[in-house]
């Protein structure tokens, strides 16, 4: 039976809660750095990531996810440019870019203290498809 869905995939990661004390400020950070589309009330913003695969919202009743625990990674076109945007908009670089196999990866903390990763494909990974 077909089921209509906002993200259209079964068993894929599709919905996130992002902890933040100030949901509106955190939403602005992700909008400005990653271009995420915001919706809902300003005090309880939701988002879609622009790919059609991930949606979510900011929650103020949970502690930030620091360096330990499950970590989400966001696919970006350029790790260095994204880290520049992260720091410009109040985030911090937690681990500078490094290679993980054929991927270029870095870790950052958003202004609320959540640690996430970003990654881009290298020319080696793109050539091996």
Regions found by a protein language model. Name each.
Residues 22-23, 74-115:
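Vicinal oxygen chelate
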Residues 15, 59, 69, 85, ...:
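Residue-level hotspots at or immediately adjacent to binding/recognition sites across diverse folds
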Residues 22-37:
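Amphipathic alpha-helical segments
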Residues 50, 105-106, 128:
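Short Asp/Glu-rich motifs
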Residues 16, 26, 30, 82, ...:
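Hydrophobic pocket/interface hotspot
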Residues 1-25, 53-54, 70-72, 121-129:
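N-terminal beta-strand motif that seeds the catalytic metal site of vicinal oxygen chelate
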Residues 35-69, 115-121:
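Conserved short beta-strand elements that form part of the metal-binding/catalytic scaffold
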Residues 41-45, 99-101, 125-126:
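Short glycine/proline-centered loop/turn elements that form peptide/ligand docking sites
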């Amino acid at each position: 039976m077909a089921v209509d869905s906002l993200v259209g995939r079964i068993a894929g990661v599709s919905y996130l809660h992002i902890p933040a004390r100030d949901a509106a400020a955190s939403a602005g950070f992700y909008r400005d750095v990653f271009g995420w589309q915001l919706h809902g009330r300003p005090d309880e913003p939701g988002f879609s990531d622009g790919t059609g695969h991930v949606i979510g919202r900011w929650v103020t009743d949970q502690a930030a996810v620091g360096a330990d625990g499950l970590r989400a990674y966001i696919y970006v076109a350029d790790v260095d440019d994204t880290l520049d945007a992260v720091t410009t908009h109040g985030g911090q670089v937690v681990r500078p870019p490094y290679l993980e196999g054929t991927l270029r990866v870095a870790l950052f903390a958003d202004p609320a203290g959540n640690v996430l990763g970003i990654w881009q494909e290298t020319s080696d990974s793109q050539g091996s498809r």
